Protein backbone atom coordinates (compact mmCIF):
# COMPACT_ATOMS: atom_id res chain seq x y z
CA UNK A 1 0.00 0.00 0.00
CA UNK A 2 2.87 2.36 0.80
CA UNK A 3 4.46 1.62 -2.53
CA UNK A 4 1.23 2.44 -4.32
CA UNK A 5 0.96 5.71 -2.45
CA UNK A 6 4.50 6.71 -3.37
CA UNK A 7 3.94 5.81 -7.01
CA UNK A 8 0.80 7.92 -7.11
CA UNK A 9 2.57 10.85 -5.50
CA UNK A 10 5.44 10.58 -7.97
CA UNK A 11 3.06 10.52 -10.91
CA UNK A 12 1.19 13.47 -9.43
CA UNK A 13 4.45 15.39 -9.21
CA UNK A 14 5.28 14.63 -12.84
CA UNK A 15 1.79 15.65 -13.89
CA UNK A 16 1.99 18.93 -11.97
CA UNK A 17 5.42 19.69 -13.40
CA UNK A 18 4.29 18.84 -16.92
CA UNK A 19 1.18 20.99 -16.53
CA UNK A 20 3.31 23.84 -15.22
CA UNK A 21 5.68 23.55 -18.18
CA UNK A 22 2.78 23.43 -20.64
CA UNK A 23 1.22 26.43 -18.97
CA UNK A 24 4.46 28.35 -19.31
CA UNK A 25 4.73 27.37 -22.97
CA UNK A 26 1.15 28.50 -23.62
CA UNK A 27 1.79 31.77 -21.78
CA UNK A 28 4.93 32.35 -23.82
CA UNK A 29 3.09 31.54 -27.04
CA UNK A 30 0.26 33.88 -26.12
CA UNK A 31 2.73 36.67 -25.38
CA UNK A 32 4.62 36.06 -28.61
CA UNK A 33 1.45 36.06 -30.66
CA UNK A 34 -0.39 38.83 -28.84
CA UNK A 35 0.66 41.46 -31.36
CA UNK A 36 -0.28 39.26 -34.31
CA UNK A 37 -3.48 37.94 -32.73
CA UNK A 38 -2.62 34.47 -34.04
CA UNK A 39 -3.71 31.42 -32.09
CA UNK A 40 -5.45 28.17 -32.89
CA UNK A 41 -8.86 29.30 -31.55
CA UNK A 42 -8.58 32.57 -33.45
CA UNK A 43 -7.70 30.78 -36.69
CA UNK A 44 -10.71 28.55 -36.15
CA UNK A 45 -12.89 31.65 -35.81
CA UNK A 46 -11.51 33.08 -39.04
CA UNK A 47 -12.11 29.80 -40.89
CA UNK A 48 -15.65 29.68 -39.48
CA UNK A 49 -16.32 33.21 -40.75
CA UNK A 50 -14.99 32.30 -44.21
CA UNK A 51 -17.12 29.17 -44.48
CA UNK A 52 -20.16 30.81 -42.92
CA UNK A 53 -20.05 33.81 -45.24
CA UNK A 54 -19.35 31.58 -48.23
CA UNK A 55 -22.36 29.32 -47.67
CA UNK A 56 -24.59 32.27 -46.80
CA UNK A 57 -23.64 34.02 -50.03
CA UNK A 58 -23.77 30.85 -52.10
CA UNK A 59 -27.32 30.12 -50.96
CA UNK A 60 -28.68 33.67 -51.05
CA UNK A 61 -26.98 34.94 -54.18
CA UNK A 62 -27.48 31.53 -55.76
CA UNK A 63 -31.23 31.92 -55.28
CA UNK A 64 -31.05 35.39 -56.86
CA UNK A 65 -29.09 34.09 -59.84
CA UNK A 66 -31.26 31.02 -60.41
CA UNK A 67 -34.42 33.08 -60.10
CA UNK A 68 -33.11 35.43 -62.80
CA UNK A 69 -31.95 32.65 -65.11
CA UNK A 70 -35.08 30.49 -64.75
CA UNK A 71 -37.71 33.15 -65.43
CA UNK A 72 -38.57 33.74 -61.79
CA UNK A 73 -39.28 30.15 -60.78
CA UNK A 74 -38.07 30.73 -57.23
CA UNK A 75 -40.06 34.00 -56.97
CA UNK A 76 -39.12 37.02 -54.92
CA UNK A 77 -40.69 35.73 -51.66
CA UNK A 78 -38.79 32.50 -52.26
CA UNK A 79 -35.51 34.41 -52.51
CA UNK A 80 -36.31 36.19 -49.24
CA UNK A 81 -37.01 32.86 -47.54
CA UNK A 82 -33.71 31.44 -48.79
CA UNK A 83 -31.78 34.40 -47.34
CA UNK A 84 -33.54 34.03 -43.99
CA UNK A 85 -33.03 30.28 -43.79
CA UNK A 86 -29.38 30.54 -44.88
CA UNK A 87 -28.63 33.01 -42.10
CA UNK A 88 -30.50 30.96 -39.51
CA UNK A 89 -28.73 27.72 -40.43
CA UNK A 90 -25.25 29.24 -40.41
CA UNK A 91 -25.86 30.99 -37.07
CA UNK A 92 -26.63 27.63 -35.51
CA UNK A 93 -23.74 25.97 -37.37
CA UNK A 94 -20.83 28.23 -36.40
CA UNK A 95 -22.27 30.79 -33.99
CA UNK A 96 -20.62 29.03 -31.05
CA UNK A 97 -17.24 29.23 -32.80
CA UNK A 98 -16.94 32.70 -34.28
CA UNK A 99 -20.11 34.49 -33.21
CA UNK A 100 -21.53 34.12 -36.73
CA UNK A 101 -21.01 37.71 -37.83
CA UNK A 102 -20.68 37.12 -41.61
CA UNK A 103 -20.97 40.89 -41.94
CA UNK A 104 -18.29 43.60 -41.60
CA UNK A 105 -20.92 46.08 -40.43
CA UNK A 106 -21.96 43.77 -37.58
CA UNK A 107 -18.36 43.18 -36.55
CA UNK A 108 -17.63 46.91 -36.57
CA UNK A 109 -20.79 47.61 -34.56
CA UNK A 110 -19.76 45.09 -31.91
CA UNK A 111 -16.29 46.65 -31.77
CA UNK A 112 -17.59 50.19 -31.34
CA UNK A 113 -19.85 49.08 -28.48
CA UNK A 114 -17.05 47.27 -26.67
CA UNK A 115 -18.22 43.75 -27.46
CA UNK A 116 -15.49 42.75 -29.90
CA UNK A 117 -11.70 43.37 -29.78
CA UNK A 118 -10.55 46.01 -32.25
CA UNK A 119 -7.34 44.12 -33.01
CA UNK A 120 -9.36 41.21 -34.45
CA UNK A 121 -11.56 43.44 -36.61
CA UNK A 122 -9.33 43.50 -39.76
CA UNK A 123 -8.99 39.71 -39.84
CA UNK A 124 -12.74 39.19 -39.44
CA UNK A 125 -13.55 41.69 -42.19
CA UNK A 126 -11.02 40.12 -44.55
CA UNK A 127 -12.44 36.66 -43.84
CA UNK A 128 -15.97 37.84 -44.56
CA UNK A 129 -14.92 39.58 -47.76
CA UNK A 130 -13.00 36.50 -48.86
CA UNK A 131 -15.95 34.19 -48.24
CA UNK A 132 -18.32 36.49 -50.12
CA UNK A 133 -15.93 36.87 -53.06
CA UNK A 134 -15.28 33.13 -53.33
CA UNK A 135 -19.02 32.39 -53.30
CA UNK A 136 -19.64 35.02 -55.97
CA UNK A 137 -16.83 33.56 -58.05
CA UNK A 138 -18.31 30.08 -57.71
CA UNK A 139 -21.70 31.30 -58.93
CA UNK A 140 -20.09 33.13 -61.84
CA UNK A 141 -18.31 29.94 -62.92
CA UNK A 142 -21.55 27.98 -62.68
CA UNK A 143 -23.95 30.40 -64.36
CA UNK A 144 -21.72 32.64 -66.45
CA UNK A 145 -21.22 36.37 -66.32
CA UNK A 146 -24.33 37.68 -68.07
CA UNK A 147 -25.43 41.02 -66.69
CA UNK A 148 -28.96 39.84 -65.97
CA UNK A 149 -27.47 37.11 -63.76
CA UNK A 150 -25.64 39.64 -61.57
CA UNK A 151 -26.30 38.56 -57.95
CA UNK A 152 -25.18 41.84 -56.41
CA UNK A 153 -27.22 44.81 -55.26
CA UNK A 154 -28.26 47.81 -57.37
CA UNK A 155 -30.65 50.64 -56.49
CA UNK A 156 -33.93 50.63 -58.38
CA UNK A 157 -34.63 54.24 -57.39
CA UNK A 158 -32.38 57.04 -56.22
CA UNK A 159 -29.18 56.45 -54.26
CA UNK A 160 -30.53 58.48 -51.35
CA UNK A 161 -33.63 56.31 -51.18
CA UNK A 162 -31.53 53.15 -51.17
CA UNK A 163 -29.13 54.61 -48.60
CA UNK A 164 -31.94 55.45 -46.20
CA UNK A 165 -33.60 52.05 -46.46
CA UNK A 166 -30.23 50.30 -46.01
CA UNK A 167 -29.62 52.31 -42.84
CA UNK A 168 -33.08 51.52 -41.46
CA UNK A 169 -33.07 47.79 -42.27
CA UNK A 170 -29.52 47.30 -40.96
CA UNK A 171 -30.42 49.24 -37.82
CA UNK A 172 -33.37 46.89 -37.37
CA UNK A 173 -31.16 43.84 -37.95
CA UNK A 174 -28.42 44.94 -35.53
CA UNK A 175 -30.97 45.92 -32.89
CA UNK A 176 -32.39 42.39 -33.01
CA UNK A 177 -28.91 40.81 -33.00
CA UNK A 178 -27.91 42.85 -29.95
CA UNK A 179 -31.06 41.81 -28.15
CA UNK A 180 -31.05 38.07 -28.80
CA UNK A 181 -27.31 37.40 -28.95
CA UNK A 182 -25.73 39.70 -26.36
CA UNK A 183 -28.32 40.21 -23.64
CA UNK A 184 -28.22 37.54 -20.93
CA UNK A 185 -31.93 38.01 -20.30
CA UNK A 186 -32.81 36.87 -23.83
CA UNK A 187 -33.36 33.25 -24.87
CA UNK A 188 -30.10 32.52 -26.68
CA UNK A 189 -31.36 29.34 -28.34
CA UNK A 190 -33.74 31.42 -30.45
CA UNK A 191 -31.04 33.79 -31.74
CA UNK A 192 -30.69 32.06 -35.10
CA UNK A 193 -34.44 31.96 -35.65
CA UNK A 194 -34.89 35.62 -34.70
CA UNK A 195 -32.02 36.87 -36.85
CA UNK A 196 -33.09 34.74 -39.81
CA UNK A 197 -36.66 36.00 -39.54
CA UNK A 198 -35.40 39.59 -39.43
CA UNK A 199 -33.38 39.03 -42.59
CA UNK A 200 -36.44 37.56 -44.31
CA UNK A 201 -38.61 40.54 -43.36
CA UNK A 202 -35.97 43.06 -44.39
CA UNK A 203 -35.49 41.41 -47.78
CA UNK A 204 -39.24 41.51 -48.38
CA UNK A 205 -39.33 45.19 -47.44
CA UNK A 206 -36.12 46.54 -48.97
CA UNK A 207 -35.48 44.05 -51.76
CA UNK A 208 -37.52 45.88 -54.42
CA UNK A 209 -35.86 49.19 -53.52
CA UNK A 210 -32.18 48.60 -52.77
CA UNK A 211 -31.70 44.87 -53.04
CA UNK A 212 -31.65 44.57 -49.22
CA UNK A 213 -27.93 44.22 -48.71
CA UNK A 214 -27.51 45.06 -44.99
CA UNK A 215 -23.99 43.71 -45.43
CA UNK A 216 -20.99 45.30 -47.20
CA UNK A 217 -19.53 41.87 -47.96
CA UNK A 218 -22.80 40.79 -49.60
CA UNK A 219 -22.49 43.70 -52.08
CA UNK A 220 -18.72 44.05 -52.45
CA UNK A 221 -18.11 40.35 -53.16
CA UNK A 222 -20.30 40.15 -56.28
CA UNK A 223 -19.08 43.61 -57.35
CA UNK A 224 -15.44 42.49 -57.27
CA UNK A 225 -16.18 39.36 -59.30
CA UNK A 226 -18.44 41.05 -61.86
CA UNK A 227 -16.74 44.44 -62.03
CA UNK A 228 -20.06 46.18 -61.36
CA UNK A 229 -19.51 49.01 -58.87
CA UNK A 230 -22.59 51.14 -59.49
CA UNK A 231 -23.58 52.89 -56.24
CA UNK A 232 -21.36 50.52 -54.25
CA UNK A 233 -20.79 53.22 -51.62
CA UNK A 234 -24.47 53.00 -50.67
CA UNK A 235 -24.01 49.38 -49.60
CA UNK A 236 -20.95 50.18 -47.52
CA UNK A 237 -22.01 53.41 -45.82
CA UNK A 238 -25.65 52.44 -45.24
CA UNK A 239 -25.07 49.11 -43.44
CA UNK A 240 -22.16 50.48 -41.39
CA UNK A 241 -24.14 53.50 -40.16
CA UNK A 242 -27.24 51.40 -39.50
CA UNK A 243 -25.40 48.63 -37.66
CA UNK A 244 -23.42 50.96 -35.40
CA UNK A 245 -26.54 52.97 -34.59
CA UNK A 246 -28.55 49.80 -33.92
CA UNK A 247 -25.95 48.38 -31.54
CA UNK A 248 -25.69 51.61 -29.57
CA UNK A 249 -29.45 52.07 -29.49
CA UNK A 250 -29.93 48.68 -27.88
CA UNK A 251 -27.11 49.30 -25.42
CA UNK A 252 -28.81 52.51 -24.33
CA UNK A 253 -31.89 50.58 -23.23
CA UNK A 254 -29.96 47.58 -21.89
CA UNK A 255 -28.89 49.32 -18.64
CA UNK A 256 -32.23 50.58 -17.42
CA UNK A 257 -30.98 51.22 -13.86
CA UNK A 258 -28.00 53.39 -14.84
CA UNK A 259 -28.05 57.13 -15.61
CA UNK A 260 -27.62 58.07 -19.26
CA UNK A 261 -24.41 60.03 -18.67
CA UNK A 262 -22.78 56.94 -17.11
CA UNK A 263 -23.78 54.76 -20.05
CA UNK A 264 -22.40 57.13 -22.67
CA UNK A 265 -19.11 57.53 -20.79
CA UNK A 266 -18.53 53.78 -20.67
CA UNK A 267 -16.24 52.36 -23.32
CA UNK A 268 -16.96 48.74 -22.45
CA UNK A 269 -20.48 47.56 -21.84
CA UNK A 270 -19.13 44.23 -20.66
CA UNK A 271 -17.22 45.98 -17.87
CA UNK A 272 -20.37 47.89 -16.99
CA UNK A 273 -22.28 44.64 -16.70
CA UNK A 274 -19.55 43.21 -14.46
CA UNK A 275 -19.71 46.22 -12.16
CA UNK A 276 -23.51 45.96 -11.97
CA UNK A 277 -23.33 42.29 -11.04
CA UNK A 278 -20.68 42.97 -8.40
CA UNK A 279 -22.79 45.72 -6.84
CA UNK A 280 -25.86 43.49 -6.80
CA UNK A 281 -24.01 40.61 -5.12
CA UNK A 282 -22.57 42.98 -2.50
UniProtKB/Swiss-Prot annotation:
Give an example GO cellular component term for this record: membrane
Q: What is its main location?
A: membrane
What GO MF terms are annotated? Answer: channel activity
Where is motif NPA 1 found?
103-105
Membrane topology, record value: Multi-pass membrane protein
Keywords, A to Z, come to:
Membrane, Repeat, Transmembrane, Transmembrane helix, Transport
Per the record, the similarity remark reads: Belongs to the MIP/aquaporin (TC 1.A.8) family. NIP (TC 1.A.8.12) subfamily.
- PANTHER family reported for this sequence: AQUAPORIN NIP1-1-RELATED, AQUAPORIN NIP2-1
Please give the name of this protein.
Answer: Aquaporin NIP1-1
Organism, by scientific name, is: Zea mays
* Gene name of this polypeptide: NIP1-1
